[in-house]
């Protein structure tokens, strides 16, 4: 009888210990939801978490991105060539018209994600054409990946035999996120579970079941989207869509007590773009200087003023460049400190 009781007590103690360990783990688990409109840079932030907190990409993993990189490069050139027609731009050299036809034919016949020499030669010749460059300069008037210039300028390196993508090549690669992707990592004695949710309109209905128990939302908006339209609706300005989405999330009853951090992303692209395209394209009331600081601060204010609970809920904002590992590391460190501070406040310790 005594032996049975002590076995029960032992089991009970073990169970209590396990429950306490689970409770401690739950208390240290941070559930992060990455939200934002399509192509704002959410998936790039996830890749950075792998680089910063999970030992990065192995050579084998980098090699798996070759097909995506080649696919992105080809699709970018096809998009530019098609836009030449739409925007009525002529090739600098009439011989490139024939290259453009060959490119379209080859694209239909090659294996997806491959880059035969004939194709890379054609893409290289097209990229040097003055008409193609003029069309590239008007990229906000059609849909073109942000990485287009990066890959096309580096095409010779990408097609060298034995090519292994660099971390920067991997970060710049683009695959539309469908569904929900979870990444786990540890930092400052916390267990992070980060959820990247597809941003395009058709994906948003999948968000709802991620809402419960979220510690922090990182909302990502592309600063450079101010003169662009949506992939899924060419009547809607991307910045307006992002503001509309942020409004619905930041004032949602689900998130009344959730920390919200705003990443105003693609500051590198924005820096170059703001020199050429005035912010009044997106915000007709804006008559301030068309500089990175002034225009950037104006955009930030448009987001922060949507917060209807400003008196009790602070929204933290950062200008970010998701492809810059040091910048993301610095900003994410600050976000982690915010999460720790908010958690201590909830426990009455701050």
From Swiss-Prot:
Gene3D superfamilies linked: GI Alpha 1, domain 2-like (1.10.400.10), P-loop containing nucleotide triphosphate hydrolases (3.40.50.300)
Residue span of region G1 motif: 31-44
Name used for this protein in its record: Guanine nucleotide-binding protein G(t) subunit alpha
Functional note: Guanine nucleotide-binding proteins (G proteins) are involved as modulators or transducers in various transmembrane signaling systems. Transducin is an amplifier and one of the transducers of a visual impulse that performs the coupling between rhodopsin and cGMP-phosphodiesterase.
Organism whose genome encodes this protein: Xenopus laevis
PROSITE patterns from the UniProt entry: G_ALPHA
Binding site for GTP: 36-43, 171-177, 196-200, 265-268, 322
Transmembrane segments: none
One GO CC term, this protein: cytoplasm
Subunit description: G proteins are composed of 3 units; alpha, beta and gamma. The alpha chain contains the guanine nucleotide binding site.
Family, per entry: Belongs to the G-alpha family. G(i/o/t/z) subfamily.
